[in-house]
Amino acid sequence: MDAVPLATPEEAWRIAKSLNYRHIGGTVVAVVQDVETGEVLMVGHMDPVAVVLTLTTGLAHYYSTSRKRIWLKGETSGHYQIVKEFRTDCDGDAVVLKVVQIGAACHTGARSCFSSPASFKIRLNRDA
């Protein structure tokens, strides 16, 4: 696995402290994309410690809002995410991780959590 730290611990904490953890459980939303294709693979949550671990190890870490703990993506499945880019949005309450996905991103075994077609159709009323 070719994970490379994206920041020193000091830089990582500076970045983590600059974010706005206003979402569930004191987290930022993390949108995960394939670095080559831009495909959205999953959405997760990160607390400050998950941000620091991600930046200092180069492997995606998340905060489980249900289990109330940090987890390393791939810790049980081996389906790691090697982080190549870490971006913050203008409000500091969301981040984008551009990753090399090892195996499936979704717990169902699918490459992406967004691979199922929508179960409903939306019709636009062009006359309105």
Curated annotation (Swiss-Prot):
Entry's localization field: Cytoplasm
Record text on cofactor binding: Binds 1 Mg(2+) ion per subunit.
GO cellular component: cytoplasm
Any matching Pfam family: PRA-CH
UniProt pathway: Amino-acid biosynthesis; L-histidine biosynthesis; L-histidine from 5-phospho-alpha-D-ribose 1-diphosphate: step 3/9
Alphabetized UniProt keyword annotations: Amino-acid biosynthesis, Cytoplasm, Histidine biosynthesis, Hydrolase, Magnesium, Metal-binding, Zinc
EC number(s) per entry: 3.5.4.19
InterPro entries referenced in this protein's UniProt entry, alphabetically: PRA-CH, PRib_AMP_CycHydrolase_dom, PRib_AMP_CycHydrolase_sf
SUPFAM superfamilies: HisI-like (SSF141734)
Record-linked Gene3D superfamilies: Phosphoribosyl-AMP cyclohydrolase
Amino acids binding Zn(2+): C90, C106, C113
An annotated GO BP: L-histidine biosynthetic process
Annotated catalysed reactions: 1-(5-phospho-beta-D-ribosyl)-5'-AMP + H2O = 1-(5-phospho-beta-D-ribosyl)-5-[(5-phospho-beta-D-ribosylamino)methylideneamino]imidazole-4-carboxamide
Co-factor(s): Mg(2+); Zn(2+)
Amino-acid biosynthesis keyword on record: yes
Residue numbers binding Mg(2+): D89, D91, D93
Main location: cytoplasm
Record GO terms (molecular function): magnesium ion binding; phosphoribosyl-AMP cyclohydrolase activity; zinc ion binding
Family assignment from sequence similarity: Belongs to the PRA-CH family.
Function, in words: Catalyzes the hydrolysis of the adenine ring of phosphoribosyl-AMP.
Subunit structure, as described in the record: Homodimer.
Name of the protein described by the UniProt record: Phosphoribosyl-AMP cyclohydrolase
Gene transcribed to yield this protein: hisI
